[in-house]
Amino acid sequence: MINKILSGSDMQDAYSAIESEWNNSEVISFQTSGSTGVPEIITFTKEQVIRSAKRTADFFDLKENAEVFCALPPVYVAGKMMALRAIVLHWNLTWQSPSGSPIIDSTYDFAAFTSQQVSQMLASSPTALNAIQKVLLGGGPLSERAAALLRNVSTNIFEGYGMTETLTHVAMRNVKEQLFFRPLKGVQFTQGEKGNLVIEDSWLNLPALETNDIVEFMKDGFTVMGRLDNVIISGGVKFFPEEMERRLSQVILQPFYISSMPDEVLGQKIVLVVEGDTQDFQLKKIDHLNLGIGKPREVIFKPKFNRTDSGKIIRES
């Protein structure tokens, strides 16, 4: 059920469309974000949606009539699944129009945000998250700076690992206590020939999925090093942009990403791409991080990054 809609008819229409699809279709459709390729439509059976919703509820210990909050786009899997969980599990859902910094004006048992939303909330209203008992993060890695700030809030914060193809999260990590992801019920992880993660989910009866994520396994879990298609080899050394970005996020406040350019000596040289202009950033700002040969050799400034509809930065080589 919907407890209230804070943003008018657009979110009410979105919920009504999802509810109609649930009541009238044998399968439920989800659109990928397009951050790693051409957007596509993926379908799941109602039984798979129900089992996914129940697994989430079990993990977070959420009962019928739980008060939950969402400010995610309804067109993609994270937002759509919040609405479907509310339908299946009889939650009271407050659904706010997507924004960079959602407004929390009540108390909630559970909420789902992107890492970018939480970072902006911490900057604008550091105590707002205290009104929520449990928070699920997704939509991209959490910066080290944001993770440190989250240790000061009372909320239980979890980062989910998953994608549209897995019907949202298949692994979780407690941001305050764990450095690695642990599989949810029925999920098994193995490593492919290229060091990439392979997912098997007997709980949802999904076929084995070979991802492009490069992972490092440890007891009971794994860490994500980066994506296979983003790896940079510079001077014969392999670098993962995502891992470097987590370190750099300690000191770089504006949006950025790591890329590479051809180099006669190194093959590829690492470059830092920053949103803004030359007045906003100087390379010496990161000297104390001791990045060694992984330090960017050049900074490229772009007035505005291209982003997906869900807010993810589109990397451009």
Segment roles from a protein language model:
Residues 27-54, 61-63:
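Conserved AMP-binding A3 loop
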Residues 11-31, 64-65:
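Conserved pre-ATP/AMP-binding loop-to-beta segment of ANL
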Residues 44-51, 67-120:
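AMP-binding/adenylate-forming
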Residues 141, 170-210:
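Adenylate-forming AMP-binding core of the ANL superfamily, especially NRPS adenylation
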Residues 123-177:
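Gly/Ser/Thr-rich phosphate-binding loop
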Residues 209-294:
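AMP-binding/adenylate-forming catalytic core of the ANL superfamily
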Residues 1-12, 40-43, 90-98:
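Short beta-strand->loop structural element characteristic of the AMP-binding/adenylate-forming
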Residues 289-313:
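AMP-binding/adenylate-forming catalytic domain of the ANL superfamily
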